[in-house]
């Protein structure tokens, strides 16, 4: 809403709710938990990552019998595999275990938030009718990343009179590994009676933008075609990962000197190369935001639960929070992270995001009443959506994974580690055996784009997301040696993603000289 002109934003304040699936489910459970026969309000429960839920339950003295463990495993597997029919059949059994085993031990698995909300909507038609009246139109952004469980929840929110629009880009579907549904566009078109529409132009990149041309070329490759033109991809190739890290930080320092604006270093995943880059940044005295934490990690979930308890405790007995009270609450949480007894690995990063939230509240939420401000802050920590305020960070340099950078933008983006076996990863061996690619000592190229496996196409989509996070310039890098998961070193080369048909790789210096 902050992007809208003042009067227009004000007119929407009481007519629109911006949240995510988990945030909306949490809001329902906070109000209607008794209807589900829960023994306590969900505010009193600790969120726990699905993967660690059973172990956390056992550590608290809880237990699951074999059949219950099997139900939980099968349900989560169906969610990851996008099997919505299996989820519908299993949701009641899964929820029974949530209520009988997890909730009495103070726990709520992350997916349990959605599954309980599904049951709530299914059992209480009046609530469903009320919601469809209160929210007659539902807009879903980044729809391509919707998983099967959230899709069932979405359908439960809708009535025959509901309006729904889903916005997304199948090419940017990068969460398949945790359940983002394949073929969602086709399925939603049938299930929800939607009319598919496709935009022909990306208006973010107009007037011959280098970044826009690169993005278009990557998209064409994902569709098995070659775009017109030959956009250039700036790439640095180091002898080893240490050389790559040193070159990136040296380039970042040079760009800071000339004032290029905000910069991001976006890695495929945290690992040896990311650690080397951060060590170099620290050595050079360059301040940066470390955003390499996962929004679904147990630590981040625990941080949000901790912050939420601080907010609710501070506002206990009050009708809301004033602007000054909100500042004090945020400051107290930050102080606890940095100097108190509650320590997190990414505590400094969370504190920086709290500062960004404070700035957002000051700049964009002046017109909120105390009760609206309280509900808004509660929703942020309930959803775990603090990262979306990254634009308000005081740090000009950010380090994140590409997955967590979706929806964000920077002036300049670095994409390290586009090295064979690191990116696209283990699929490299399969591609070579199938004759899809051709490898030499210095490069790997795709020779038969029509046979590309889905896994390789998804890795291209991840590269596309990374490239299009840049407004002005993008720099890619690779190395001729990589560190394996076992700590050994292996001869490598730039991956096929740096030599896609229709894209010309050039050195950073050549690109800068022409710019």
Residue ranges and their predicted role:
Residues 2-74, 285:
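Conserved P-loop NTPase-based nucleic-acid remodeling module centered on helicase motor cores
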Residues 17-23, 109-112, 117, 395-402:
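Conserved two-lobed SF2 helicase motor
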Residues 193-194, 200-286:
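Helicase P-loop NTPase motor core
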Residues 447, 454, 472, 478-515:
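Helicase C-terminal subdomain and adjacent C-terminal extension
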């Amino acid at each position: 809403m902050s992007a809208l002109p003042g009067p227009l934003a004000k007119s929407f304040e009481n007519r629109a709710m911006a949240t995510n699936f988990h945030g909306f489910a949490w809001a329902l459970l906070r109000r209607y938990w008794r209807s589900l026969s829960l023994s306590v309000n969900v505010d009193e429960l600790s969120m726990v990552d699905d993967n660690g839920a059973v172990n956390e339950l056992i550590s608290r003295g809880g237990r699951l019998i074999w059949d219950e463990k099997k139900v939980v495993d099968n349900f989560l597997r169906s969610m990851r595999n996008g099997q919505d029919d299996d989820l519908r059949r299993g949701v009641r059994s899964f929820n029974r275990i949530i209520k009988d085993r997890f909730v009495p031990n103070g726990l709520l698995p992350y997916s349990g938030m959605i599954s309980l909300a599904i049951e709530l909507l299914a059992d209480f038609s009046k609530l469903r009718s009320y919601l469809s009246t209160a929210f007659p139109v539902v807009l879903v952004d980044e729809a391509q990343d919707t998983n099967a469980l959230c899709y069932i929840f979405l359908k439960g929110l809708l009535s025959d009179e509901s309006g729904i629009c889903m916005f997304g880009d199948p090419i940017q579907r990068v969460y398949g590994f945790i359940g983002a549904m394949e073929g969602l566009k086709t399925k939603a078109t049938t299930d929800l009676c939607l009319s598919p529409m496709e935009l022909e132009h990306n208006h973010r990149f107009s007037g011959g933008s280098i970044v826009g041309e690169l993005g278009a070329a990557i998209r064409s490759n994902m569709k098995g075609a070659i775009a017109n033109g030959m956009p250039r991809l700036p790439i640095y190739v180091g002898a080893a990962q240490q050389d790559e890290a040193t070159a990136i930080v040296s380039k970042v320092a040079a760009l800071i000197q000339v004032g290029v604006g905000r910069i991001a270093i976006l890695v495929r995943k945290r690992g040896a190369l990311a650690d080397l880059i951060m060590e170099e940044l620290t050595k050079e005295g360059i301040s940066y935001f470390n955003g390499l934490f996962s929004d679904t990690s147990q630590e981040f979930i625990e941080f949000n639960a901790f912050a939420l308890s601080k907010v609710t405790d501070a506002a206990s007995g009050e009708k809301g929070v004033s602007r000054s009270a909100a500042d004090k609450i945020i400051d107290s949480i930050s102080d606890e992270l940095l100097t108190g007894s509650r320590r997190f690995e990414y505590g400094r990063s969370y504190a920086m995001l709290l500062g960004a939230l404070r700035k957002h509240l000051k700049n964009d939420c002046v017109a909120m009443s105390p009760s609206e401000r309280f509900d808004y802050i509660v929703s942020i920590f309930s959803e775990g959506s603090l990262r979306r305020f990254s634009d308000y960070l005081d740090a000009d340099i950010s380090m994140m994974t590409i997955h967590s950078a979706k929806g964000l933008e920077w002036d300049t983006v670095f994409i390290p580690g586009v090295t064979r076996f690191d990116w696209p990863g283990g699929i490299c061996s399969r591609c070579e055996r199938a004759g899809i690619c051709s490898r030499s000592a210095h490069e790997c190229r795709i020779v038969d784009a029509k046979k590309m496996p889905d896994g390789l196409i998804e890795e291209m989509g991840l590269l596309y997301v990374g490239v299009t996070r840049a407004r002005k310039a993008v720099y890619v890098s690779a190395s001729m040696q990589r560190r394996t998961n076992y700590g050994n070193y292996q001869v490598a080369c730039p991956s096929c993603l740096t030599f896609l048909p229709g894209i010309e790789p050039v050195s950073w210096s050549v690109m800068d000289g022409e710019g």
